[in-house]
Regions:
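Alpha-helical transmembrane segments and their immediate juxtamembrane cytosolic regions
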Residues: 1-292
């Protein structure tokens, strides 16, 4: 996903000068229209080259690696449209984050608005998604599309599964609430829940006290270090034959992340990877200014 983040950050550059209202409108439109555009592009591509041919050669099916630079067209298609996190639809979350970051988050009225708006969006999308899942024929239609048992499919629709990418040519995909499916309903569910949690945390901050929140504040300052660090831990765990999905491992990662966040907060320093990125960004900016 780091490749996707890199592309998202580049696309965000023209938006940095916009105000919260404009960014919010863009994010809202992107949440709805992004998945529709992905649906249209992928459906058209499958119609042009054939369904099976598209599945075999239309995406990487793995996280991008250095060798994929030798296939720039396929790499770009995977990052923007056909991969697990297509920027064409997932970019909405970055723009939403930019919009929220422009708001005066220390005001309780703003925090309450974020909580209320997020909860409303989440509830509305949840009602729509639940109605679609309960509608007669939905599970059978999905099972026929991806070639799975209806009982397994019913569970898959509630938990998420990469094979749902095979559903994209069917417009029903746009209304599925399945996590990480990239549908319109799933996008609004995720965005609404994220806003609701953020608003609730902002409202709870004065009640909890700054000292108790320092591990969380620090963790928020070193997201890249924590993300890459947890990938390294998961790779080491997987190499030992242990189960990466073990609940004890999740608890350990949470504790380690909070400990690292507290250390970053107390030291007042960036994380190691954040420091590297800051130096690279500063060097690139100075070179760009110097070359004018």
């Amino acid at each position: 996903i780091l490749c996707h983040y890199a592309l998202l950050f580049l696309l965000a550059l023209p938006l940095l000068g916009l105000r919260a209202r404009a960014l919010g409108l863009i994010a809202g439109a992107w949440l709805v229209l992004g998945p529709v555009l992905v649906f249209a592009v992928v459906a058209a591509a499958q119609a042009a080259v054939g369904r099976q041919e598209f599945f075999v050669g239309g995406r990487l099916w793995l996280s991008p690696g250095p060798a994929d630079l030798l296939r720039p067209g396929l790499l770009l298609a995977d990052l923007t449209v056909t991969g697990y996190y297509p920027v064409l639809s997932w970019g909405a979350f970055l723009v939403l984050g930019l919009a929220l970051g422009r708001l005066p988050l220390d005001r309780r009225r703003v925090a309450a608005g974020i909580l209320g708006g997020g909860a409303t969006a989440w509830a509305a999308a949840g009602v729509v998604g639940a109605a679609v899942l309960r509608a007669p024929g939905t599970v059978g239609r999905v099972a026929a599309a991806i070639g799975t048992d209806p009982v397994e499919t019913a569970l898959t629709l509630r938990t998420g599964e990469p094979r749902l990418a095979l559903l994209i040519p069917d417009p029903l995909w746009l209304a599925l609430p399945t996590p990480h499916s990239g549908s319109v309903v799933a996008a609004v569910l995720a965005a609404g829940w994220a806003c609701a949690v953020l608003g609730a945390c902002l409202l709870a901050r004065p009640l909890v006290g700054h000292a108790a929140l320092r591990p969380l504040v620090g963790a928020g300052r070193i997201p890249l270090t924590l993300y890459v660090g947890h990938l390294v831990v998961l790779a080491l765990v997987d190499a030992t034959g242990l189960d990466p999905a073990d609940g004890a491992l999740l608890a350990a990662l949470v504790v380690l992340s909070l400990a690292a966040g507290l250390a970053a907060e107390l030291s007042g320093r960036r994380g190691p990877l954040e420091a590297v990125m800051a130096r690279l960004s500063r060097a690139g900016g100075e070179r760009a200014v110097g070359g004018r």
